[in-house]
UniProtKB/Swiss-Prot annotation:
Cofactor note: Binds 1 zinc ion per subunit.
UniProt key word Signal: no
Coiled-coil region list: none
Recorded family membership: Belongs to the FPG family.
Keyword Hydrolase: yes
Cofactor: Zn(2+)
Catalysed reactions, as listed in the record: Hydrolysis of DNA containing ring-opened 7-methylguanine residues, releasing 2,6-diamino-4-hydroxy-5-(N-methyl)formamidopyrimidine; 2'-deoxyribonucleotide-(2'-deoxyribose 5'-phosphate)-2'-deoxyribonucleotide-DNA = a 3'-end 2'-deoxyribonucleotide-(2,3-dehydro-2,3-deoxyribose 5'-phosphate)-DNA + a 5'-end 5'-phospho-2'-deoxyribonucleoside-DNA + H(+)
NCBIfam families cross-referenced by the UniProt entry: fpg, PRK01103.1
UniProt organism field: Shewanella oneidensis (strain ATCC 700550 / JCM 31522 / CIP 106686 / LMG 19005 / NCIMB 14063 / MR-1)
ZnF endpoints (FPG-type): 236-270
UniProt keyword terms in alphabetical order: DNA damage, DNA repair, DNA-binding, Glycosidase, Hydrolase, Lyase, Metal-binding, Multifunctional enzyme, Zinc, Zinc-finger
Family annotation (PANTHER family): FORMAMIDOPYRIMIDINE-DNA GLYCOSYLASE
Record protein name field: Formamidopyrimidine-DNA glycosylase
Binding positions for DNA per the UniProt entry: H90, R109, K151
Amino acid sequence: MPELPEVEVTRQGITPYLVDQTVVDLIVRNPSLRWPVPELAKQIIGQTIRQVRRRAKYLLIDTDAGTSIVHLGMSGSLRILPHDTPVEKHDHIDLVLANGRILRFNDPRRFGAWLWCQLPEEAHPLLEKLGPEPLTDAFNVNQLAASLAGKKKAIKLCLMDNHIVVGVGNIYANEALFAAGIHPEAEAGKIDIERLTVLVAEVKQILAHAIKQGGTTLKDFTNADGKPGYFAQKLHVYGRGGETCTQCGNLLSEIRLGQRTTVFCSICQPR
């Protein structure tokens, strides 16, 4: 599943091709995504795209009339292509631009979404209760400590809770907890401020580095130019259950936590 770095890399890739461009057509081949695609054509055709933003794992394509909210789901991607590029299987939506290019939404598993809202989009039900962005000052040790106070849930589940902090999915939660030396099943409310300080710093560093590397490519993600990300080459624990720890040589443990695969080192991340 594309996580925050992959969505941010996509945003950076498509923005130069979209901003200040007029939408001349919208082609919806399959409206049956995670939620039905609304009747977008009458709202967006003729509109000029003002900016492309990201909130959590949502891409926000702004026009004067409103905002398209795009979510890549489990396997979705957005590509900038020439307008005459042949349509392939799972190419569900084309946003056709006056510059002769299209923004094409491909989603094999159809868990993605393309929605529309009038401004202010912050009041949209998908966005209004989201926590702080991890790469901003709003995500800090004081905020995290307050959010975790009294919680008995495993820290990994809290780290992946979008009400606490957005965009930290399974890949980066595994990696950040390993880097901070925190066991993924540790009771969130009992982690001391010193370790939370380290965890906040590691979340920020790992996400920023993943963005710089173009995201993590496992089996689904490519960026807006169709190129893979390279952060997968630097993963220390995610997807490496049963292999040796890069720090101590111990065999990495793999468990299921919150229905997600969780990998950790029992030596470097003591309970």
